Structure formats: structure tokens, C-alpha cells
């Protein structure tokens, strides 16, 4: 993902491009179990299956107005909502997106007799985006919401959809949650909440 406005500034020769975003939801999602599942498969088949999952994730992102920023090396993805297109309901959109990711994984498991799962961490707050690097320029995100979303995602090894206090407070009347511990951040301790959702992925 590189917004067209950023790409245009880059093509015009502008350097040190960055933008402050006051309120954005950030999603870290990691697919669990794919490496073990694909170990016995021919490489072409495993790549094809992974591509089908990534394509389904991208289609889900488009449906929910979520922006896929980049794929991660550990079969994960970093995404945002409200970054390129400001959205008042960015928190609830990310929850709906995360739920659909779990459903996609569940269908994959049914079709391929697999035992994959997904772990998602979400936070909302200020984000800075910009181009970094000289020889290999990439569009990157940093800031409080990016850091905390990653901490929430990494707070447990279990599958599930985990959110920060800010996301919980924004959607608590819409979705049910269970307390799932705490993580440390720059301001101290942050509660983590797990979305109560019936899905077909192993815990």
C-alpha cells in the first residue's frame, strides 16, 4: 500500500515524506500452523494454497474498507483502517475484518483437512506514515497504535482476536469481550481483551 498522494510526491522528487494521522486502527494478523501443514506438500502446492489465503484476505480487506499495508515474513499481515480514507467507524470495521479472516481460515481447514488458526491484535490511535530508506524505499507506519497493536498481538500464543482498551471501548456495545491479561506500553499497563466469537479454528 502506498497512497496515490504519497506516490505522486515521491515521483515529483520530494524527500522526507511523512504524514500524521490522529486516529487510525492498526491490525497485526498472523496465520498459525501453515508451515507445519505445508511441510508434506510440494512447494508449488503450498505456495498456491498460501496465495489463495492471501487473496481471500485481500478481498475481505476491500469489503471492509481495510488497507493492507504489507505482508509479513511469518505468514502475517499489517493492515490499517482510517489511514488512507478517514473513517469514523474504523474500530468496528477492523473487528468485522478480523472475524472474516477467522471464517476464511475455518473454510480453508474444512476444505483441506488443515488445522490452521489466526491470531489478531488491534489498537486504535495516532499513527505516522511515510517513506523510509534511500536505496530501497518502503512505505512504513510507526507510532503508538502500531506499537501497541503488535504488543497486543504478541501478548499470547493462542489463536483469537485480541484488542486494546481503546478498541474495546469503541465497540463494547457491539461485540462481546473477555479480559485476556495485560501488556506494557509507554504509558504503563494496558488491558487486553479477547473477542468472544464462535469460529472453527483451534484455540
PLM regions: where:
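Regulatory cytosolic signal-relay segments
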Residues: 1-22, 48
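Hydrophobic alpha-helical membrane-association signature
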Residues: 46-53, 94-97, 101, 144-148
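Catalytic/regulatory signature loops of cyclic-dinucleotide turnover enzymes
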Residues: 105-111, 123-124, 144-169
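Conserved nucleotide-binding and Mg2+-coordinating catalytic segments in signaling enzymes
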Residues: 4, 8, 25, 29-35
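Cytosolic regulatory/linker segments at or just downstream of nucleotide-handling modules
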Residues: 127-129, 155-203
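A generic structural signal for short hydrophobic patches within well-formed alpha-helices
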Residues: 7, 34, 72, 77, ...
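Catalytic core of nucleotidyl cyclases, primarily class III adenylyl/guanylyl cyclases
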Residues: 24, 29, 60-93, 105-144, ...
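Conserved long alpha-helical elements within nucleotide-processing catalytic cores of c-di-GMP signaling
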Residues: 22, 35-58, 62, 67-71
